[in-house]
Amino acid sequence: MLSGGKGADTLDGGSGNDVLYGGTGNDMYRFAIGAGVDRIEDYDTTTGNADVLSIGQGVSINQLWFQHVGNDLEVSIIGTGDQITIRDWYSNAAYHVEQFKTSDGKVLRDSQVNALVSAMAGFAPPVLGQTSLSTDYQKALNPLIAAHWK
């Protein structure tokens, strides 16, 4: 378990399965290939708060899979067992990470996540070892992915 406090914290669980507590402030959570199964527990009601999920090198926007599970948001790197869950995402906006940012500078805002979740809900998640989306998935999802990641 890694815990931040007040202020801007950077939390990186590395490999393995971790719980990351952000606290208040503009926190950065790191997620990459080899990260394992991590969980973010973030609750911040501060106006203008800007927490970021930083996605490591070698992960493209087309490799991220978004799912609504209970009250949580799960983000997986397809082809791997790596997953990060943002606990209680669907309970209240105070639990949100406000931005998802890739190493090449692409950004997805929390207000855009549900469009991807809804589109991906119509498909089964790619199986372990499948590192790219099938042609059918690409046709359906790539326009939406490109429209929301800027």
Name the predicted role of every residue range.
Residues M1-V69, T80-H96:
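Acidic, glycine-rich calcium-binding repeat modules characteristic of RTX/beta-roll
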Residues S76-K150:
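Low-complexity acidic/polar repeat-biased segments
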